[in-house]
Amino acid sequence: MESAAKIKEILQAAELEKLPDFIAAYQEDPRNGVQKLVALAQKKLDALEKEKQRIENLKKYEKEYAGYTYICGIDEVGRGPLAGPVVAGAVILPKDCNILYINDSKQLSEKKREELYDVITKEAVAWAVGYASPERIDEINILQATYEAMREAIGKLSPAPDLLLNDAVTIPGVNIRQVPIIKGCLLYTSPSPR
């Protein structure tokens, strides 16, 4: 019989997809410590299922506009700097994309943002970033500089998007259908990178 410490090591090394196997292997073990580990594994599994459902719910807009080939999510990245550029990100994800834990970047830890950045940029059909300098912000104001950064990001995408899901704005000077969504970065899975 394996020690509870060894079983704990097995759980810590187990990938999320292997949790059902872990639970099946140890659920009949009568030891208290092992049952706590099984309960922990079940809690992780329940959280994973809840996250999968949350991601599925986020696909509302992608499903609604399924007739479009390249749906792009676009958002500014931390608009409102006192000193620094305004940055906008645009991304087109594949239609079958299921990246877990995507969320508004302000809702994520720095570590999780970095992990998701790596996954998103690897999985994306296309992604790009646009910038407007502090000097440009001073010239045209923060909102116009944000639009400029967004247009730059959109212009860098290849393939070009045929639909934009925007976080609460309509970007002037863009001849692509736009759907401005209030709190958009929380409501669809095509986020901007970082």
What label would you give each PLM region?
Residues K6, A13-Y61:
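Conserved catalytic/binding loops enriched for acidic/polar residues
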Residues C72, Q178-K183:
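Short pre-catalytic strand/loop immediately N-terminal to key active-site residues, enriched for Gly-Thr
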Residues D46-A83:
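Long amphipathic N-terminal alpha/beta scaffold segment
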Residues T170-I176:
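Short loop/helix-cap segments at secondary-structure boundaries that form the rim of catalytic
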